[in-house]
Amino acid sequence: MELYINKILLAVSLFLSINAFASSLSDDAIERGVNSTCSSYLNQIEKSYKLNGLNITFAHPTNSASLPSLHISSQKYNNGSSTFSATLTPDKEYCYISTVLVTSVNNQTCSEISQLKIEVAPELQVSRYADGNFTIITPKDNTYQIILTVQGETGCTITEARMLWPGR
């Protein structure tokens, strides 16, 4: 009986510490008590990436304003899916942010995607590895990096990673 009660308590505590529903990431962050500066930055990022999917927020159950939080949003498209992740780390009036956006497309090759990105921004630095199975695209200012990973004949996984230090 004690084991059964422990399992129920564990399930309830996990449910209370993890939110998974379709409200916005920034709304989840505010509701969970995440630092207001971090929540504001998350709102801006959410709008710039046009995130509108299933969201999950991980925040400390008793000290969410002072400790890092993790925010995830997944979306499905007619030609693939994407998952966005942001880690917010509060530091008094500042907030440090790392983001990762992984998009899987099943009807466009990595070569096509790479070519399109270079056409839009010719100054991008492009490096290919493992017989072209991986491509890293980096702007001159190193504000982000994109990794293209070949997925079969006509698919590609696009991973974009950023680290932000707003106000510092």
Q: What spans do the regions from the language model cover?
A:
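Sec-dependent signal peptide recognition
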Residues: L3-A11
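N-terminal signal peptide c-region/cleavage motif recognized by signal peptidases
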Residues: S17-N19
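N-terminal secretory signal peptides
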Residues: S23-T89, L164
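Non-cytosolic coordination micro-motifs
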Residues: L25, V34-Q44, K50, A130-Y144, ...
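A cross-kingdom feature marking solvent-exposed beta-strand/loop segments within repeated
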Residues: I56, L70-I72, A121-P139
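Amphipathic N-proximal alpha-helical interface segments
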Residues: N63-V100, D141-R168
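Long, charged/polar, surface-exposed segments that mediate recognition or autoinhibition
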Residues: N79-D131
